[in-house]
Amino acid sequence: MDATTPLLTVANSHPARNPKHTAWRAAVYDLQYILKASPLNFLLVFVPLGLIWGHFQLSHTLTFLFNFLAIIPLAAILANATEELADKAGNTIGGLLNATFGNAVELIVSIIALKKGQVRIVQASMLGSLLSNLLLVLGLCFIFGGYNRVQQTFNQTAAQTMSSLLAIACASLLIPAAFRATLPHGKEDHFIDGKILELSRGTSIVILIVYVLFLYFQLGSHHALFEQQEEETDEVMSTISRNPHHSLSVKSSLVILLGTTVIISFCADFLVGTIDNVVESTGLSKTFIGLIVIPIVGNAAEHVTSVLVAMKDKMDLALGVAIGSSLQVALFVTPFMVLVGWMIDVPMTLNFSTFETATLFIAVFLSNYLILDGESNWLEGVMSLAMYILIAMAFFYYPDEKTLDSIGNSL
C-alpha cells in the first residue's frame, strides 16, 4: 500500500444515504411547509370531524358546520399547491393553472350541488362570490390597509380596465334576468322558462369565448402589462409565507393538489347534502345560505391574502385579487356551470331575481365609483363593508321561492 493512500476512502467514510429515508424526510418537510403556509390551517381539525359526521349521518347541522369549516383551510392548501406548481410551469401554463384551479372549490361545490338538483344554491353562490369580492374584500382591504395611513394609491388605469370588463361581464349575466322580468307571468311560464334556458346557454358560450380571449390578452398579447403585478405577487407572498426559502417539488405539488381535491369533494358532498335539513332547522333561506354562507368557503383564503397584501401597502395586488376573482366568477365559473347543467340535463340558468339583479348592479356601481380616482382610505372601506352588511341583512329577511309562490297563490 502506498504511504499516500488513505486508510478509508471518501465513499467508505460516509455511508450512502437510504433513498427511502431521504424521500420520507422530504415528504415530512413538505407537509410541515404546507401546514404552516396559511394562518387558516388551524381549521384543519374540522376535516376529520366533518368526514366522520357526514359518513355516519350524525347531526345535520354539525355536519354542515364541520364541513363548512373544513373546506376553508383545504381551499388555502389547494391554492398554495396550485401556486407552487404554476411557478415551475412557466408564465403561460402557470397562468392557465391559476385560472383553472383558482376557483376549484367553487366549481367542486357547484357541480355537486347541481348533481343534487340544488340549482338555487348554485345561482346564489355565484352572485354571492361577486358581492363578497366587490364589497366585503374591497372594504376590508381599504380598512386594514388605510387605518394607519392618510390614503393609499393604486394604478388607476389598470383598476378601471378590470372594473370595466367586470361591468360588461355582469351586464351580460343580467340580460336573461331582465328578459324574464319584462315578460308577464301566467300560463305560458313553462314556455318562457324554456326560452330563458336557451338564452342562458347561448349567453354562457359567448361569455366563455370572451374569457378565453381575456386569458390570451393577459398571458399573451399584453403580458407586459401584468409583469409588474406578478413580481409584486412573488415578493409579497414570500414575505407572507412562514418559510419563504422552501418550495414544493412538482411531484409534491401534484400529490397535494389531487389529494386535497378529493378531500374537498367529500366535504362538499356532505355540506351540500345537509343544506335542506339546515334550512328546515334554522329557518334560513336557501338564497341566504348560497349568497352569504357558501361563498366564504371558497374565498376565505383569498380574503385573508388580500387583506395581508393591503396592509403591506400593495393595493394594486390587493385590488387585482379582489376584482380578478370577481372576473373569474363572472367570466368563467358562472357560464361554465350553465354548460355543466346542460351536459347533465339540469336546467341551470342565469335567471336571477329582480332583487338579486339590483344588488349586483349596486355592487358593481359602488366598486367602480370607489376606485375611480385611484386613491382609497379607510372610510371608503367602511362604506363598502356597510353596503355588504345591508345586502346580507336584506337577503336574511328575503323569503325563499316556496314562500313567494305560496304568497302569490293566496292573492
Curated annotation (Swiss-Prot):
N-acetylmethionine, modified sites: M1
Residues in the Cytoplasmic compartment per record: 1-30, 83-91, 147-160, 227-252, 311-319, 372-380
UniProt-listed InterPro entries: CaH_exchang, CAX-like, NaCa_Exmemb, NCX_ion-bd_dom_sf
Residue ranges that the UniProt entry lists as topological domain Vacuolar: 54-59, 115-126, 184-203, 276-287, 343-348, 399-411
Source organism of this protein record: Saccharomyces cerevisiae (strain ATCC 204508 / S288c)
Protein name (Swiss-Prot/TrEMBL): Vacuolar calcium ion transporter
Function: Has a role in promoting intracellular calcium ion sequestration via the exchange of calcium ions for hydrogen ions across the vacuolar membrane. Involved also in manganese ion homeostasis via its uptake into the vacuole.
UniProt cross-references to Gene3D superfamilies, sorted A to Z: NCX, central ion-binding region
Organism phylogeny: Eukaryota, Fungi, Dikarya, Ascomycota, Saccharomycotina
